[in-house]
């Protein structure tokens, strides 16, 4: 069984998912996120850290697929396993399978809208963009509730299938 050495997330909502998955996997690693971490910075940091990881360690990143030309990077560099009707993907980095991405398509808000029927309009989406990390995670737990936990369990089970713990 491979262990996870680092977990990175692109935004607060992605961080909430990352923390819940890490807990489910029994990981004792802190999820790293700063307000400056967009998708490209998360990927760049993960690639840099990969060079210094032990052979049995993995990095998990929680990112958005995005729209338009920026999707190409994901398409070219990750082997994708689709979940939730192609709205969520678990991607294994083609150049180094120790980097695994959980990818929301096209973004976390779009994924939640399609799967839960929430966060579809701009006012609701703002709830995921303001306040502290704790407030955003509490918002997700309260509004999405049981569905949030099911999504976390599905992601966790998929990661276990590819032997990540």
Language model region names:
Residues 1-2, 16-32, 44-60, 65-165:
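C-terminal accessory helical subdomains adjacent to catalytic cores in phosphodiester-
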């Amino acid at each position: 069984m491979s262990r996870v050495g680092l977990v990175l997330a692109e935004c607060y909502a992605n961080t909430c998912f990352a923390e819940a998955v890490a807990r489910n996997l029994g990981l004792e690693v802190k999820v790293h996120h700063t307000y400056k971490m967009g998708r490209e910075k998360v990927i760049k940091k993960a690639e840099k850290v990969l060079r210094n990881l032990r052979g049995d360690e993995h990095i998990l990143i929680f990112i958005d697929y995005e729209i338009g030309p920026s999707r190409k990077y994901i398409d070219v560099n990750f082997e994708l396993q689709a979940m939730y009707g192609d709205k969520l993907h678990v991607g294994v980095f083609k150049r180094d399978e120790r980097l695994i991405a959980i990818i929301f398509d096209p973004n976390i808000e779009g994924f939640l809208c399609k799967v839960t029927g929430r966060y579809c309009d701009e006012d609701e989406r703002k709830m995921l963009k303001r306040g502290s990390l704790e407030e955003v995670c509490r918002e997700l737990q309260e509004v999405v509730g049981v569905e949030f936990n099911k999504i976390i369990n599905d992601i966790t089970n998929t990661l276990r299938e590819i032997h990540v713990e």
